[in-house]
Amino acid sequence: MHFKNGNYLERKIKMLHEKSCGAIVYRKSHGNIEILLIKHINSGHWSFPKGHVEGDETELETARREIMEETGIDVILDPTFRETVSYSPKKDTHKVVVYFLAKAKNFDFVPQEEEIAEIRWVDIGYAVNILTYENDKIIVNKAKIAIKESA
């Protein structure tokens, strides 16, 4: 708000709202649970596969498509595990990211060259040492509990 001649003038800032969907992709390997982490080319941060909702896609459709595009891995999504993260990447942008839990159907990945610098399968307990953002670390811990409960 600004003052002008004793009157309030409201400055309207147009907020951009973005929504992305993705998943914590996991597999069981030699009795251990491993999750798939991706390193983004532009920012260099480690996270989970995710991307923007396109057209009239559902959240689950977006998550499945983005995982396939970024990693080449097909998944079985668990719609009962749904975690959201909200943040503002820019002053005029509000972003919501919806994460599901996804069991990998195949394990060999093919990185999307334009966006992904590296992909790794890592032990779920070690993932918190690689993930860049605190919100992602919290979600991994919730995913670990959900996976163990479903076993």
Write out the residue ranges for each language-model feature.
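Charged phosphate-binding loop/patch that engages nucleotide di/tri-phosphates or the phosphate backbone
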Residues: 3-9, 129-151
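Conserved N-terminal beta-strand and adjoining loop/helix that marks the start
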Residues: 7-34
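Anionic group-transfer/hydrolysis microenvironments
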Residues: 24, 41, 125
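Short, glycine/serine-rich, charged loops/turns that create anion-binding
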Residues: 28-30, 42, 53
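Short, acidic/hydrophobic/Gly-rich beta-strand patch recurrent on exposed beta strands
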Residues: 36-39
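Short small-residue beta-strand/loop micro-motif enriched in glycine and branched aliphatics
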Residues: 45-48
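Unchanged
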Residues: 51-139
